[in-house]
Amino acid sequence: MQYKNLGRSGLRVSQLSYGAWVTFGNQLDVKEAKALLQACRDAGVNFFDNAEVYANGRAEEIMGQAMRDLGWRRSDVVVSTKLFWGGQGPNDKGLSRKHIVEGLRGSLKRLDMDYVDVVYCHRPDATTPVEETVRAMNWVIDHGMAFYWGTSEWSAQQITEAWSVANRLDLVGPIVEQPEYNLFSRHKVESEFLPLYSTYGLGLTTWSPLASGVLTGKYAKGNIPADSRFALENYKNLANRSLVDDTLRKVNGLKPIASELGVSLAQLAIAWCASNPNVSSVITGATKENQIVENMKALDVIPLLTPEVVDKIEAVVQSKPKRTESYR
């Protein structure tokens, strides 16, 4: 396992990490979670991602209990959570000072931890002034509830505004963004965010490297495995949007490239994400130990991604974003 600095910070995170979205509390209980988390640690993973909204908070409870039962030292792992959707009350969501402070307290209680290493704004909040959010994030850092803060699914303009406020007030800005990034979703990471990497030292912890499992190659039109994410009732709409003919055609076109390299399609897709130098960590998800073992082998695939192989991939997916023109 390789470890990279999270953006321009001194925090070191494993190049591949594990996230609790969909899995903990939806498909897995504590016993199963313990087995998966230990498989991750055995592979060298030190970064684990969560959110207050995952399984309505149950995902945090399961992760915290599993880590306690496994007897892990808190200082050996990096744990993050995300705040935005906390509950049904008018102040239980968004990025107000009230919800950031109370929401993080709730997350820490569920995790049974004194702090998280990174706390994210799970989405931008158009109803709260950015200055209030920046000040609130600095407050939880100053009070030892978190060490760093970041954003998730924010635009480059929104991140820039947060940094401008932080610099003006001599406060800490967001060191990391968590965007979707895979062979079918590339614009933000490869185009929109380009100025942010050098200007603010922005790090990335990217999610959905397998495009919700589409890039495993296990899905075909009208064929959804019963134990897969798309078989869950809440993900039927996502399945309908994802399993379109053009996407499935491209997936089938990638399979021979993976076969030539002697690797699985999933390993090829994860390695492709991890090979981007601006990506600090690729967040993976799995419901079975063997999936984790196979996913971690993606690290061995990165050296195989020669310019010739990358060109073959590009010829199939045809998803490379055009560089944004600069008029400055």
Curated annotation (Swiss-Prot):
Entry's InterPro entries? K_chnl_volt-dep_bsu_KCNAB-rel, NADP_OxRdtase_dom, NADP_OxRdtase_dom_sf
What positions belong to coiled-coil segments?
A: none
Q: A Pfam family matched by this chain, by name?
A: Aldo_ket_red
Would you identify the family this protein belongs to, as annotated?
A: Belongs to the shaker potassium channel beta subunit family.
Report the active site residues. 54 (proton donor/acceptor)
**Highest taxon of the source?**
Eukaryota
Gene3D superfamilies named in the record:
NADP-dependent oxidoreductase domain (3.20.20.100)
Q: Which GO terms describe its molecular function?
A: oxidoreductase activity
The family database entries (SUPFAM superfamilies) matched by this protein are listed as: NAD(P)-linked oxidoreductase
- Residues binding NADP(+) are 21, 27, 49, 152, 178, 207-211, 218, 229, 285, 287, 291, 294-295
Give the record's GO CC terms: monoatomic ion channel complex
This chain belongs to the protein called Probable voltage-gated potassium channel subunit beta
Q: How does it assemble?
A: Forms heteromultimeric complexes with potassium channel alpha subunits.
The UniProt entry's GO biological process terms, in alphabetical order, are: monoatomic ion transmembrane transport; potassium ion transport
- Functional note: Probable accessory potassium channel protein which modulates the activity of the pore-forming alpha subunit.
Q: What UniProt keywords apply to this chain's record, in alphabetical order? A: Ion channel, Ion transport, NADP, Oxidoreductase, Potassium, Potassium transport, Transport, Voltage-gated channel
